Amino acid sequence: MAERKGSISGLTDDEAQEFHKFWVQGFVGFTAVAVVAHFLVWVWRPWL
């Protein structure tokens, strides 16, 4: 078998860091929207 060079994903370190930065920003944005949505629903109809 041929040896693999570099990372498993095939990305360079800089590309991987850039991808990670955008992935984290997207995750934080999604989580913020979910928290706001849950808060608004809880204000409308408290479940506790």
Curated annotation (Swiss-Prot):
One of its GO terms (biological process) is photosynthesis, light reaction. Residues 45-48 are periplasmic. It is a single-pass type II membrane protein. A bacteriochlorophyll binds at H20, H38. InterPro entries: Antenna_a/b, Antenna_beta_CS, Antenna_beta_dom_sf, LHB-1/5, Light-harvesting_complex. Signal peptide: none annotated. Keywords: Antenna complex, Bacteriochlorophyll, Cell inner membrane, Cell membrane, Chlorophyll, Chromophore, Light-harvesting polypeptide, Magnesium, Membrane, Metal-binding, Transmembrane, Transmembrane helix. GO terms for molecular function: bacteriochlorophyll binding; electron transporter, transferring electrons within the cyclic electron transport pathway of photosynthesis activity; metal ion binding. GO terms for cellular component: plasma membrane; plasma membrane light-harvesting complex. The chain crosses the membrane at residues 22-44. Residues 2-21 are cytoplasmic. It is found in: Cell inner membrane. Antenna complexes are light-harvesting systems, which transfer the excitation energy to the reaction centers. An alpha/beta heterodimer. The core complex is formed by different alpha and beta chains, binding bacteriochlorophyll molecules, and arranged most probably in tetrameric structures disposed around the reaction center. The non-pigmented gamma chains may constitute additional components. Belongs to the antenna complex beta subunit family. This is Light-harvesting protein B-870 beta chain.
